[in-house]
Amino acid sequence: IKITIVLIDNHGYASIGGLSKSVGSDGFGTKYRYRTESDHPDGETLPLDFGQICAGMGANVLVAHTRDAFGAALQAAREITDRPVCIITEVDRRQRVGGYESWWDVAVAEVSENPAVQQAREKYEGDKTKERHHL
């Protein structure tokens, strides 16, 4: 199958981690980390080798560390026609995009002892009253 996969490695679930932080949950469980003596996943980053995983499934793996290298990898991927291609690029999980001037209805826990979650719930309830239904 001719397919090109772009694997963006942010060492976890950065998008959902940002969402989790925005609702007071501090991104729990959204980083690929070793567990420490505290039994929490707050140790060193897990050394996941996505390239080996993809190669093990038969893909040709290209790694791009820069924008130019990414462009070159895309071009090279077009020329590989006999099997899947996976382009892997590592990104900074802390880098975010700007706001969207919209509201996403993501419910926040109603009951929590965490003040950040309580604040997020209060804001959520206020924002929910402004929700508009278009259908």
Residue ranges and their predicted role:
Residues 1-135:
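Thiamine diphosphate
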